[in-house]
Amino acid sequence: MIMKSTLTFILGFFLVQFSFAADDETCAIMIGDEIDPEEFSEVAGKKVYFCCGSCVKAFDANTAYYIKALPSLAKKFSDAEKKKLGVDKVKLMEQRYCPIYPERVVNPNSKFEVYKGKKVYFWSSSAIRRWKRDPDKYHAEAVKRGHLKG
């Protein structure tokens, strides 16, 4: 009987721990990438985990923007915390994703190129180099995915 109760307690403990970790299993900025427990930022006393240092750096430089743009991050903070961080003052861009790396979320400080009179934001310099090889092709692909307007 004691053994059964102990096993039930241990199983319950791990299920609770797993349910808390479930939200942080994938990166919010590089959508779908597994988080690295050593790559995190602490905001309002909460640890926000990412897959790599590049995401930590992007988040730290644009914290309020990413919290407003990404529901997975917004739900981690109360309305009062978001207000204190300035999330309510953030104006979201039309574009959310890099046209070359569509699983990566861009921000107003991301590198950009002007394409047919409009700014197109990119995750990295390597994304811009690929874009420049055939901007019409990559633009069409991003429009088809709904990541850029036509």
Regions from the language model: what does each represent?
Residues 5-17:
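Bacterial N-terminal signal peptides
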Residues 19-150:
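Intrinsically disordered, low-complexity terminal tails/loops enriched in metal-binding residues
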Residues 1-3:
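N-terminal secretory signal peptides that target proteins for export/translocation
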